Amino acid sequence: MTPNETLDLHGFRHKEALELVQDTLQSLDRQGSFSLTIITGNSTVLQQRIFEEILQQTPYHYYVPGWNLGQIVVSHTQW
């Protein structure tokens, strides 16, 4: 497993943020196993869009940690 990567979406419009998340996940997937923390801040709308438009169509595991509701942790283990 690679070290945890971080993607901070502060300052991005939703469309740009979604494209950046998609591109980052594709890049990390090509490398194999990964862990990615996506920082969304207080935007529950953006979080929901990331869940519905990107993550639900992937085999990745993801969750919003209880200690920081402004982020999404995504992980993938390739055997």
How would you describe each model-predicted region?
Residues 1-79:
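Long, charged, low-complexity intrinsically disordered regions
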